[in-house]
Regions:
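Solvent-exposed edge beta-strands and adjacent loop segments
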Residues: 1-63, 98-130, 135-139, 144-146, ...
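Noncatalytic modules at the cell exterior or secretory-pathway interfaces
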Residues: 122, 165-170, 216-238
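Beta-strand signatures of extracellular beta-sandwich domains
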Residues: 183-187, 240
Length: 250
């Protein structure tokens, strides 16, 4: 049975744009160019760099200044430096976020921004985030929601161990009570109930998108550890881990 796209989620830096997005499209392609020259016995081609993007269609639900609406957030990132972190999580249920594949543009900006204003309809918007400086990454969502204290979250089996490191991506949407050096760890173990080792730590004192590298061997079971709330009473965030050679090509 086909899976509904309605449970997908879209994150842009410190904004959860899920309820303002009508559709999203992940695009990946590898082009070739003909390089046939004299003396060639057949046509010759080379493979060029891969290209990728995340395109969105959404609604202009709020046009107030700094209100987190699509109109301003796309415009602010149009042709800007590649500093935005965008993630598209594909989910198969309303609450089953952990373990869901998530496509991440770690350092991107907007290269297309279209607004429609029909007299008899709603304000609509179309935009595209380009590959940016680090291309497209595929990871697994380990946590999405609010945390109110330190401790471990449920572990998840990523299917195999990795040997070439990877990256952790964190989106912090809101902080209640303020935070100073709050920290989130991603840990791994060979079994669900095994001994966990720290693979990466992300520290933050404000909302936004953050990343940290994982190096070397990474075990098959991953979990999020809320190491410090930084003085906050609640933090809303999403955590994604991309393991080279497991969740994406090495």
């Amino acid at each position: 049975m086909a899976t509904k796209g309605r449970w997908s989620r879209l994150w842009v830096d410190d904004f959860d744009m899920s309820t303002k997005t009508a559709s999203a499209e992940v695009s990946m392609s590898i082009a070739t160019e003909e390089v046939t020259a004299f003396q060639a016995t057949a046509k010759e081609f080379i493979t060029t760099d891969p290209e990728s993007s995340i395109k969105i269609t959404g609604y202009v639900s709020n046009i107030g200044n700094n209100a987190g609406g699509w109109e301003q957030e796309l415009h602010d990132r149009f042709g800007a430096a590649n500093t935005s972190q965008v993630g598209l999580m594909l989910a198969d249920s309303a609450t089953g976020d952990a373990g869901m594949p998530t496509y991440v543009l770690p350092a991107t900006s907007v290269d297309e921004d279209k607004i429609s204003a029909p007299a008899s309809g709603v304000l609509g918007i179309n935009g595209s985030f380009m590959a940016g400086d680090y291309g497209l990454r595929r990871g697994i969502c380990l946590w999405y929601g609010s945390v109110t204290g330190t401790g471990n979250k449920t572990s998840f089996d990523i299917g195999a161990a990795g040997s070439a490191g990877g990256d952790v991506y964190v989106w912090v949407f809101s902080i209640t009570g303020g935070a100073t050096n709050a920290s989130i760890k991603v840990q791994s173990a060979t079994t669900s109930g095994g001994s966990y080792s720290d693979e990466a730590t992300v520290t933050f004192s404000a909302v936004g998108g953050f990343t940290a590298a994982m190096t070397g061997a990474i075990s098959q079971w991953l979990r999020v550890n809320i190491a410090s709330m930084g003085g906050a009473s609640a933090i809303s965030l999403a955590v994604v881990a991309a393991v080279d050679g497991v969740t994406q090509p090495a």
